[in-house]
């Protein structure tokens, strides 16, 4: 029984270690702070590689970054299948970074774009509120990650700091 549990623990640790490297690699390749990707992943899945989350509007999210099923047809053109997103941590992280980079390209490197990763780009008061709530939660997680590395960021409830100034820390 102990050997069986040890094997499961080692597999889990191996997946987490691989995923950690992938946050750094995807961050480098997409010019996104890897800690921001980590914060989004924690918010989306609590770092669970095989997480599936129900989205009442578009279907469901898959894996660490909760890549939404609405993107599956586009991803299929690149050979990415839905099952890859829950079994390959690196592919999931890179895919999430890709969609965050699209949001940054569309709206600039802003917390509103981070919010759009989850709540989309539709312009309405409700969507604006959802984007702000999501971005605020990601920012809270992000500051925790930075704090654990000895980096202090402004803690604010009124407005989020400029993302470029935060990423440079």
From Swiss-Prot:
- Signal peptide stretch: none
Output the Pfam families linked to this UniProt entry. Answer: SLT
Which InterPro entries does UniProt cross-reference here? Lysozyme-like_dom_sf, Transglycosylase_SLT_dom_1
UniProt KW keywords: Plasmid
The UniProt entry's sequence similarity note says: Belongs to the IagB/IpgF/P19 family.
UniProt protein name: X polypeptide
């Amino acid at each position: 029984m102990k050997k069986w549990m040890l094997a499961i623990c080692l597999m889990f640790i191996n997946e987490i270690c691989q995923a950690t490297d992938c946050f750094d690699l995807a961050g480098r390749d997409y010019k996104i702070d890897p800690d921001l990707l980590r914060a989004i992943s924690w918010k989306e899945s609590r770092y669970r590689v095989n997480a599936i989350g129900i989205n009442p509007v578009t279907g469901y999210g898959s894996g660490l970054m909760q890549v939404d099923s609405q993107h599956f047809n586009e991803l299929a053109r690149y050979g990415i299948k839905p099952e890859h997103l829950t079994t390959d941590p690196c592919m999931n992280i890179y895919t999430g970074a890709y969609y965050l980079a699209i949001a940054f390209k569309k709206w600039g490197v802003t917390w509103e774009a981070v919010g759009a990763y989850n709540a989309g780009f539709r312009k309405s008061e409700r969507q604006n509120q959802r984007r702000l709530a999501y971005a605020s939660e990601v920012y809270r997680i992000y500051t925790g990650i930075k704090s654990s590395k000895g980096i202090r960021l402004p803690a604010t409830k009124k407005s989020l700091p400029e993302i470029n100034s935060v990423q440079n820390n």
